[in-house]
Regions:
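Contiguous beta-strand segments within globular domains
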Residues: 730-763, 767, 807-813, 895, ...
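Beta-propeller blade termini and top-face loops
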Residues: 10-740, 747-750, 779-782, 790
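Short acidic/polar inter-strand loop motif in beta-rich domains
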Residues: 820-824, 856-864
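Beta-strand-rich binding/interaction modules
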Residues: 442-444, 752-753, 759-776, 850-854
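Glycine-centered tight-turn motifs at strand-turn-strand junctions
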Residues: 773-844
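Low-complexity, Pro/Ser/Thr- and charge-rich linker/hinge segments at domain boundaries
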Residues: 702-728, 865-897
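Sec-dependent N-terminal signal peptides
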Residues: 2-9
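Mature extracytoplasmic or organellar-lumen-exposed domains after removal of signal/transit peptides
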Residues: 866, 897-997
Length: 997
């Protein structure tokens, strides 16, 4: 596969991932504004990259998508030069569901380009502070590895714009920097918070230590002193994370959110940190203080204070009392507050739901339903048409999104929440797509919008353990059988009304702490004998009795008798708490399986995929070609091509053509983000990202077909997938505005993929079943640049398409229409799609049936069969469609004939503008009458009449009504007579035209 391996990354570069939503914001940790440019704000989603708005949050644009990471924890804009922006990667949190980063980035052109600066091993950067007077002087809080000790943590300083960093505050390899702020009145005064915390490898486990504390430097960060007077300490209070805020109008006043074992509290200092007092005892104000550590002070009034927590709170009395400023019953979970120093009523909030802006002090806010930064856990697709893509979204609940919108795009109308819990799976019933199973475990019915808990054990007990994500899988051999797992495996055949436990506890028998827990090993207060769960299930599509189960504590079991007995087949490569993230049962051999192993919780960022071909007796690691820092979350096998595998890492999708022996990137146009799950749905590859919602790669036939020999050919035509005749846009109303968020629909027609070894002129022809050429496209076709067309602005118009003649793989789309007839007036539907509205009239729809694609290039002519099928929702008999097509063809031909006659008349009239006979023959647009009235026997009025009736016939996939048929037959007869008279008159007129000697 060497040749293919070298070329495939560029070979498939024209394939295109399309985002489909949901457009509901996800966890956003970083936020900053630009005081000198009102309306400009930047936010960083924890796995969604960096976004900018220039219109106060009305729309958001990604500006970091070409970078190698999407996990963002901090953004800082230099006040003295707002073109200078610093980004810290890694979430900067301590929680069981996070993604790490790779250091600090800088832009010096307002986000148009980026440079990686360093601190790669820090993994998590929660805060960056830039000197308000010097854009090259900055401090970076580096939290460090969430699951292990490391040296690159603490507070770092740079005086050269990040070209070099110096660690200026450090405690030990277990303590990191949590916050850093610069005194706006005196930039040599810097405050910083250190935090000693470690995530446990099991769910919801966290350790802490005595390293946490608050520090101050008065000499620009060279030396530091601890600030302890009046603050909690670790031994007495269990001191944890600290968040800092300075009053810009009185910089001696500071506020601190402080986490302790008793809860979170707000402290205030009025002497520049020398002494502190707990100013507020309201537990709501600093709730979950290890998750939310944000306090900000109004830039003008030092008594107005805001804290970000489950709710955002506001105080007007210096922090003594608070009222809710923004929040919701479920908890929006706010992380960042930015207040415009020049306009304090303008604020930016970043939360688990996305980012919102206010310009009136919180009276109203922009929406977070315009940010495609959803953190999806898993993905499943139902069997409806078009199919829906479903999964749980972190913090917001589960959602299902149409894979194809009815209006030429996927809008807010095309997705809906599904009440099956935010975490984990949302699995449609294969026999009833309106029923969804999800969470831990519930059943939701779309028709009634009601949800029922169907847990095997409604009230948890010591023998029944579940965490936030539990596997839910239907049997691929019996669509009535549903599997669910806790620490054991369960099966139901009646939709969860009753359950059968089909396994014993499959997790580790004895509590074990891996080496990365380190010095905290003896501090776990619980120390239960068992704390793992079954995290992955994979029923075999080859053998109904075979089921694989993997645990989050590093075990794999297999049953070959439907769960009566289980055999442990754990690979020797697995260590305790190596999480079996996904298991995939082989589609071609019952003894084959693949396991994606996530070892982030072992402080191991390396990729791990295991393969067995003998039922688990032996396993082989298959990761060649995967990047060293690419933790693997999922691996899947294509059900049609043996050896074609896909995997998802923390940054991208990868593909293997040789059963995992070698991997290469399939990122294409997708931004770097955590790939949590993927499935093959028919000919499509559907992906759940944990920061950018769902994505679909349409028609993976080229991936199924590629071989070494194929890559070496001068030209190759791939087998087209079955094309569905679907109306691109069935909206009959005003379109959604272009600035409304939208996902992409599949290509509008038949996808034709071809490969050129070298540049060559290309011709693509579509032939019907009788060998007649339906359409012909050439790389030499003339295409005009898109401009305004009459009253239609250019941003609505679909550009003309022609086949590419460049070397490489190309994707061309035939829109399933015959050639368009010439018409005096073209137009665009009121139901337009931004940048994708075709001009009308188009040619008649091609009938469902068998066609041939013929590609001529590089001196060769290649053919492939193409099947066109009707939209499965349309039940019109074939005879009705044929009647419609025949009548439409005749009307199109008559319209074309009429139009060309008008053009001839107009050319003659250019030379003879006063010729009354020619003027009468042409007629005018003013003479057009409604269809119920007979127009004058002239070409232009009849052109409008033909065009109107043609459009009516082509507007639906139904047989024409009898009255439409009668009207068409009459019109066609009259048009033929008029055209014949016109042709005769033109011939006479041409004879009268004197010849030029």
């Amino acid at each position: 596969m060497i040749f293919t391996l070298i070329l495939v990354a560029s070979l498939f570069s024209e394939l295109h991932w399309r985002p489909i939503g949901p457009f509901r914001g996800g966890r956003t940790k970083a936020a900053a504004g630009v005081p000198t440019s009102p309306g400009v704000f930047y936010v960083g989603a924890v796995n969604g990259g960096v976004w900018r708005t220039v219109d106060y949050g009305r729309t958001w644009t990604p500006i970091f998508d070409d970078q190698p990471t999407g996990s963002i924890g901090a953004i800082a804009v230099a006040l003295s030069n707002p073109d200078v922006i610093y980004v810290g990667s890694g979430e900067g949190l301590q929680r069981p569901d996070l993604s790490t980063g790779d250091g600090v980035y800088r832009s010096v052109d307002g986000g148009r380009s980026w440079k990686h600066l360093g601190l790669r091993e820090g993994q998590q950067i929660p805060q960056i502070a830039v000197d308000p007077k010097d854009p090259n002087r900055l401090f970076v809080a580096v939290l460090g590895h969430p699951y292990g000790p490391n040296e690159e943590r603490g507070i770092f300083r740079s005086i050269d714009g990040g070209e070099t960093f110096q660690r200026v505050l450090y405690k030990d390899a277990d303590t990191g920097g949590a916050d850093v702020v610069i005194d706006p009145a005196n930039p040599r005064v810097v405050y910083a918070a250190l935090w000693e915390a470690r995530q446990a490898p099991w769910e919801n486990g966290e350790f802490s230590g005595p390293g946490s504390g608050l520090y101050k430097s008065a000499d620009g960060g060279t030396t530091w002193k601890a600030l302890t007077r009046g603050l909690p300490d670790f031994e007495r209070d269990g001191l944890g994370r600290i968040g800092l805020g300075i009053a810009p109008s009185r910089s001696s006043r500071l506020f601190a959110t402080v986490a302790t074992k008793q809860g979170g509290f707000l402290y205030r200092s009025d002497d520049a940190g020398e002494s502190w007092a707990r100013i507020c005892d309201d537990p709501r104000v600093v709730e979950r203080a290890d998750d939310f550590a944000e306090v900000k002070v109004d830039p003008v009034n030092p008594d107005i204070v805001y804290t970000a927590s489950v709710v955002t709170w506001k105080s007007t009395d210096g922090g003594r009392s608070f009222t809710a400023f923004r929040g919701a019953p479920g908890g929006d979970d706010y992380h960042r507050i930015w207040i415009d120093p020049l306009r304090p009523a303008t604020m930016l909030l970043a939360s688990d739901q996305g980012a919102v802006v206010t310009v009136n002090g919180g009276a109203t806010w922009s929406s977070w339903y315009n940010q495609p930064t959803a953190q999806m856990f898993h993905v499943n697709a139902d069997n409806a048409f078009p199919y829906r893509v479903c999964g749980g979204q972190q913090e917001s609940g589960a959602a299902c999104v149409l894979s194809r919108g009815p209006e030429g795009a996927i809008t807010v109308r095309d997705w809906q929440p599904t009440a099956v819990e935010e975490y984990g799976y949302a699995v449609p019933d294969p026999l009833d797509p309106d029923v969804i199973y999800g969470g831990r475990i519930t059943r939701w019915d779309r028709r009634t919008r009601q949800v029922q808990d169907i847990s095997p054990v409604p009230l948890r007990n010591a023998g029944y353990r579940v965490i936030r994500t539990q596997p839910i899988v239907f049997s691929p051999t019996d669509p009535r059988t549903l599997f669910f797992a806790s620490n054991t495996v369960w099966k139901t055949r009646d939709g969860g009304r009753s359950w059968q436990q089909i396994s014993h506890d499959l997790t580790r028998r004895m509590w074990e702490a891996p080496a990365n827990v380190g010095k905290y090993r003896g501090t776990d207060p619980a120390r239960p004998e068992q704390r793992g769960v079954v995290y992955a299930l994979a029923p075999s599509p080859r053998d109904a009795a075979v089921l694989w189960a993997g645990t989050d504590d590093g075990l794999i079991h297999r049953t070959r008798d439907g769960g009566k007995t289980w055999q442990e087949v754990t690979p020797k490569q697995l260590v305790p708490w190596a999480k079996v993230s996904i298991l995939e049962a082989g589609h071609f051999e019952a003894g084959t399986a693949y396991a994606a192993i996530n070892t982030l919780r072992l402080d191991d960022l390396r990729p791990h995929i295991l393969r067995t071909r003998n039922g688990g007796s032996a396993w082989q690691e298959i990761v060649r070609g995967l990047p060293g820092g690419g933790i693997v979350n999922v691996v899947r096998e294509d059900p049609l091509r043996r050896g074609l595998l896909f995997c998802g890492t923390e940054q991208a999708v990868y593909v293997s053509f040789n059963d995992g022996d070698d991997w290469q990137p399939l990122r294409l146009n997708m931004p770097a983000t955590s790939i949590r799950d993927l499935v093959v749905k028919g000919d499509d590859l559907v992906v759940a990202t944990h920061g950018r919602g769902f994505w679909i790669l349409d028609d993976i036939q080229p991936l199924r077909e590629v071989t070494d020999a194929l890559v070496g050919l001068d030209v190759h035509l791939f087998a087209p997938q079955t094309a569905l005749r679907i109306r691109w846009n069935t909206n009959s109303d005003t379109p959604m505005p272009p600035d409304e968020p939208r996902g992409e629909d599949p290509p509008d027609g038949a996808i034709i993929d071809y490969l050129l070894k070298a540049g060559s002129e290309v011709t693509i022809e579509i032939l019907d079943g009788g060998g007649k050429v339906v359409r012909r496209f050439s790389s030499g076709d003339r295409t005009e640049p898109v401009t305004d067309d009459g009253i239609v602005p250019r941003w609505w118009i679909r550009p003309a398409r022609r086949p590419s003649s460049d070397a490489g793989l190309h994707r061309f789309v035939w829109d399933l229409h015959w050639p368009a007839p010439a018409a005096l007036e073209g137009g665009y539907s009121i139901a337009a799609v931004p940048r994708d509205t075709p001009k009308e009239p188009r040619g008649p729809w091609a009938l469902p049936g068998q066609y041939t694609v013929r590609l001529t290039a590089a001196g060769r002519s290649l053919t492939r069969p193409l099947t066109v099928r009707m939209d499965p929702r349309v039940k019109t008999p074939e005879a009705g469609l044929r009647q419609q097509f025949a009548l439409s063809q005749r009307l199109a031909e008559a319209l074309d004939r009429n139009t060309r006659l008008v053009e001839q008349v107009r050319r003659l009239r250019n030379d003879r503008p006063d010729d009354a006979a020619l003027a009468a023959l042409e007629g005018s647009a003013e003479e057009r009458k409604p269809l119920v009235e007979e127009p004058q026997p002239a070409l232009v009025p009849w052109n409008a009449r033909l065009g109107a009736l043609y459009s009516l016939l082509e507007s639906t996939d139904l047989a024409p009504t009898p009255q439409a048929v009668r009207a068409a037959e009459k019109l066609l007869q009259q048009s033929a007579e008029l055209s014949a008279r016109a042709e005769k008159a033109l011939a006479t007129q041409k004879q009268m035209t004197p010849r030029v000697p």
